[in-house]
Swiss-Prot record:
<feature type="compositionally biased region" description="Polar residues">
    <location>
        <begin position="28"/>
        <end position="41"/>
    </location>
</feature>
<feature type="site" description="Cleavage; by spore protease">
    <location>
        <begin position="70"/>
        <end position="71"/>
    </location>
</feature>
<comment type="similarity">
    <text>Belongs to the gamma-type SASP family.</text>
</comment>
<feature type="compositionally biased region" description="Low complexity">
    <location>
        <begin position="76"/>
        <end position="86"/>
    </location>
</feature>
<feature type="compositionally biased region" description="Low complexity">
    <location>
        <begin position="16"/>
        <end position="27"/>
    </location>
</feature>
<comment type="function">
    <text>SASP are proteins degraded in the first minutes of spore germination and provide amino acids for both new protein synthesis and metabolism. These proteins may be involved in dormant spore's high resistance to UV light.</text>
</comment>
<keyword id="KW-0677">Repeat</keyword>
<dbReference type="GO" id="GO:0030435">
    <property type="term" value="P:sporulation resulting in formation of a cellular spore"/>
</dbReference>
<keyword id="KW-0749">Sporulation</keyword>
<feature type="region of interest" description="Disordered">
    <location>
        <begin position="1"/>
        <end position="96"/>
    </location>
</feature>
<dbReference type="InterPro" id="IPR006341">
    <property type="entry name" value="Spore_gamma"/>
</dbReference>
<dbReference type="Pfam" id="PF04259">
    <property type="entry name" value="SASP_gamma"/>
</dbReference>
<feature type="site" description="Cleavage; by spore protease">
    <location>
        <begin position="36"/>
        <end position="37"/>
    </location>
</feature>
<feature type="compositionally biased region" description="Polar residues">
    <location>
        <begin position="1"/>
        <end position="15"/>
    </location>
</feature>
<feature type="repeat">
    <location>
        <begin position="61"/>
        <end position="87"/>
    </location>
</feature>
<feature type="compositionally biased region" description="Low complexity">
    <location>
        <begin position="42"/>
        <end position="57"/>
    </location>
</feature>
<protein>
    <recommendedName>
        <fullName>Small, acid-soluble spore protein gamma-type</fullName>
    </recommendedName>
</protein>
Length: 96
């Protein structure tokens, strides 16, 4: 087993280096995540996509948003009316 005693200058941890790294880390902590997030988000591209989406919604006649448009596009109104009429007819027949 190696039991060599280290002098302060030979210590395994370089205190000055640790202080410097901590300082650099602290400086980056306040804005590091925000900077990374901003660098991965192309604001111009997002604006362009939002504009295209808004134009598409205006062209399709959407009033309140995408969900209403999607719901309406997947609902066959004529089929629903027909089913409602059949249901009402069955109710009338059952009441007689």
């Amino acid at each position: 087993m190696n039991t060599k005693n280290f002098t302060p200058q030979e210590s395994r941890t370089n205190a000055q280096q640790v202080r410097q790294q901590n300082q650099q880390s602290a400086q980056g902590t306040s804005s590091g995540f925000a900077t990374e997030f901003a660098s991965e988000t192309n604001a111009q591209q997002v604006r362009q996509q939002n504009q295209q989406s808004a134009q598409a919604n205006r062209m399709s006649g959407a009033t309140a948003g995408g969900f209403n448009t999607e719901f309406a596009s997947e609902t066959n109104v004529q089929q629903v009316r027909q089913q409602n009429q059949q249901s009402e007819a069955k109710k009338r027949n059952n009441q007689q």
